[in-house]
Amino acid sequence: MYATVTVTVLLLISSGIFCQNEKLCSNGGTECNRHCGQNNTVGICHGQNGKLKCECVEYKRKMF
């Protein structure tokens, strides 16, 4: 019984995370960039058609 409840909770949490990522990446990634920009990072959408996951990465500019 506890295993069933645990699996159900994990599935609900993961589906909520994916829905949020799809929302952030649905309009070409501008919302993802805005979301990640709050932490001084750059948002990159990737996955199927570039709409599955919003990932925040640190951007380092090289000075020559």
UniProtKB/Swiss-Prot annotation:
UniProt signal peptide: 1-19
Record has Disulfide bond as a keyword: yes
Protein's UniProt keywords contain Secreted: yes
Cysteines paired by S-S bonds: C25-C45, C32-C54, C36-C56
Principal location class: secreted
Expression tissues: Expressed by the venom gland.
UniProt subcellular location: Secreted
An example Gene Ontology CC term for this record: extracellular region
Protein name per the record: Putative neurotoxin-H
Species whose genome carries this gene: Lychas mucronatus (Chinese swimming scorpion)
Lineage: Eukaryota, Metazoa, Ecdysozoa, Arthropoda, Chelicerata
